[in-house]
Amino acid sequence: MRIVFAGTPEFAAEHLKALLDTPHQLVAVYTQPDRPAGRGQKLMPSAVKSLALEHGLPVIQPPSLRSADAQAELAALRPDLMVVVAYGLILPQAVLDIPRLGCINSHASLLPRWRGAAPIQRAVEAGDAQSGVTVMQMEAGLDTGPMLLKVATPIAADDSGGSLHDRLAALGPKAVVEAIAGLAAGTLRGEVQDDALATYAHKLNKDEARLDWSRPAVELERQVRAFTPWPVCHSSLAGASLKVLGASLGHGSGTPGSILEASRDGLLVACGEGALRLTRLQLPGGKPLAFADLYNSRREQFAAGQVLGQ
């Protein structure tokens, strides 16, 4: 089959790698325009673009697919199928209609739960027992199309957004390759999603990563895991920023945000319900460290009675 691939981040690049190992012809790779990154704000290619160029694949980077010219360029490729993974651009119906077999998408959740931009982190944050990958036939709605294939994986008690991402990035490509084989053979039939079961995974932002100590400790512990490695939960102590990259549930009570105890086991902080033990922190200008290492050199900085987030 003649396949056009569309994707941008590393999660998508893993899918492109899998397609490179199939007999199908990759006629073009679509990815978002290069973006400024790093301290120098130098324009950097996406993970998908870098991989595509390594393998000599044509790369197309339109700012939008809404224009007639962009759609004509895609149609000229005569694709049988378009595979879309975390592309980041809206595909209008006119684009979805161009490939002979339409467009399929690998989405990092068990649809219809967690439609939207941040399904991996929202699943961890919500305390879901499992996550997975759904390969669906795309339609104009956001992640609403018929489901072709689903693969599930348990969410462990210590899973972070990063660890679950990596696991799904390994499961997704295999599911897409299997779905393409089924479509080519005409043996795959889509299952309509039940909209009544749908939830929406809103895009992450740095503002919501600020820890609200009035919330229950069990919720904050999940939030810390979900938001690692990005956007990283944070608070403040004595006016200085404090990034929280590891935490566990503790015992104790007090004014929300107050330090109950500091030891090599962690910094115990009172929450609206229960207490959270901070086990891995990053101070301004420093690198992430186990709290035991910070305690050895800065124990006076974490004296009990101080309040975080003020």
UniProtKB/Swiss-Prot annotation:
- UniProt KW Transferase keyword: yes
Q: Show the catalytic activity.
A: L-methionyl-tRNA(fMet) + (6R)-10-formyltetrahydrofolate = N-formyl-L-methionyl-tRNA(fMet) + (6S)-5,6,7,8-tetrahydrofolate + H(+)
Q: Which Pfam families match?
A: Formyl_trans_C, Formyl_trans_N
- Give the top-level enzyme category: transferase
Cite the entry's keywords alphabetically. Protein biosynthesis, Transferase
Any idea of its EC number? 2.1.2.9
**GO molecular function: any one?**
methionyl-tRNA formyltransferase activity
Q: List the disulfide bonds.
A: none
Which residues take part in binding (6S)-5,6,7,8-tetrahydrofolate? S109, L110, L111, P112
Kindly state one GO CC term assigned in the UniProt record: cytosol
Tell me the domain of life. Answer: Bacteria
Q: Which InterPro entries match?
A: Fmt (IPR005794), Formyl_trans_C (IPR005793), Formyl_trans_C_sf (IPR037022), Formyl_transf_N (IPR002376), Formyl_transf_N_sf (IPR036477), Formyl_transferase-like_C_sf (IPR011034), GART_AS (IPR001555), Met-tRNA-FMT_C (IPR044135)
In which family does this protein belong, per the annotation?
Belongs to the Fmt family.
Q: What does this protein do?
A: Attaches a formyl group to the free amino group of methionyl-tRNA(fMet). The formyl group appears to play a dual role in the initiator identity of N-formylmethionyl-tRNA by promoting its recognition by IF2 and preventing the misappropriation of this tRNA by the elongation apparatus.
Tell me what this protein is called.
Methionyl-tRNA formyltransferase
- Source organism per UniProt: Pseudomonas paraeruginosa (strain DSM 24068 / PA7)
Gene name for this UniProt entry: fmt
